[in-house]
Amino acid sequence: IMAEQDLRENPFRDEIYTYLLDHGYCAGERSDYDYAHALDTGKLFAFLEATQPEELNKLKATYGDRYQSRYIDLLCQKIDNRGLLTALNEWVEDYASGTKFQIAYFKSSIKSMSEGLALYEKNIFSIRREFTFEQKKDPYRVDLAIFLNGIPIVMIELKKQTAGQKASFEGTKQFRMTRN
């Protein structure tokens, strides 16, 4: 555990990061991040392969090499139209291929306990530290980002009280004024 007197932001960030890795989270890889769509496509398609391979094969049969871009477009449309929280609980559907994908599995939506719990446990939680979410010379970054199945669900910006920063002001201002 972090020493009490060490109140800097980086050791605290690293402590959170290490704790989550030690408790089942995966490390996110920069190379898997799709900046244009704000998704970790590596974790996204790993989740789909692990939980819905038949549906994914139908999508591949319909779209060939473009199946990933088609799914990403459908997912982004769903999130844009319905909002992230609603989208996480609904299906992503492609009518041309006749496919329906669950974005995540929740304990409350489990139909059959054994099968449902197995699917729930295949959710992929990942974490990135010093996460830059845009490609430009001086990109915005957050201290930590948490993803569920490749979808960013939590951004954490740590503040140091000893440096005069206040999370209620500095963090809020930073997210409202300097983030897209």
Model regions: which residues?
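An alpha-helical interface "stripe"
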Residues: 2-180
